[in-house]
A protein has these predicted regions:
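Conserved inter-motif catalytic segment of the P-loop NTP-binding fold
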Residues: 2-100, 104
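Phosphate-binding/switch region of NTP-binding enzymes
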Residues: 95-207
Length: 207
């Protein structure tokens, strides 16, 4: 099963069905509150751990629950107090509040998720750090995300330029079939900036 937390209201069950996703195994939760998400994950992992330990006591071969959590996107999350600050015209304090709750969030959920082998995948916004000697892309949300993540991948995209392998393949297929195939899509570059499990290797793929 997959718990999909949508903080940007960009998903609905109908659109997910069109992509061929089994919505019977998907739980869609739409919220932008980091406190609410923390409570959802904490309560969920506590209940799953209780059930798992009970089953394990009677059956040593009991498997851990198969679940994946996806948050899209972490950069769009805010805090309950942050919403109140916007309403009262004090939004300037919001970033510091969010960074504090972000650190608390990871401290609360990292260990329970690890004990149950539940992966949590986050998408995030990036910004260019102008303070460094060479401007580099950094993830929003403070350092807590960088410290707690096992893998961080920076994605960038580029248009097909007609000289890449994908364009060459489409051109060859056009000639073989005798019809014109318009090149579309983009080339995505995946650059792992942190990984605890393997040597980071930059790669590219076509969408």
């Amino acid at each position: 099963h997959c718990l999909l937390i949508d903080s940007e209201n960009s998903y609905d069950v109908t659109s997910l069905d069109r992509f061929g996703i089994d919505t019977d195994r998907l739980i869609l939760k739409q919220t932008n509150s980091i406190e609410e998400i923390g409570a959802i994950i904490s309560n969920l992992t506590a209940n799953l751990m209780t059930q798992y330990e009970k089953q394990l006591a009677s059956d040593p071969d009991t498997e851990k629950p198969r679940l994946m959590i996806v948050i899209d996107s972490f950069g769009a999350l805010t805090t309950t107090s942050g919403i109140d600050q916007v309403a009262s015209g004090e939004a300037g304090k919001m970033n510091l509040t969010k960074q504090k709750y972000t650190a608390q969030f990871f401290r609360a959920v990292t260990t329970p998720l690890g004990q149950l082998d539940i992966p949590m995948i986050l998408t995030n916004h990036v910004y260019v750090d102008q303070g460094s000697y060479v401007p580099t892309a950094k993830a929003a949300g403070g350092e807590a995300l960088n410290y707690n993540a096992s893998i961080i991948m920076m994605l960038s995209k580029a248009k097909l330029d007609g000289k890449d392998a994908i364009s060459d393949k489409l051109k060859q297929e056009s000639e073989d079939l005798g019809i014109e195939i318009q090149s579309s899509g983009c080339i995505v570059t995946c650059n792992p900036t942190k990984t605890r499990f393997a040597k980071p290797i930059k790669s590219k793929f076509y969408i």
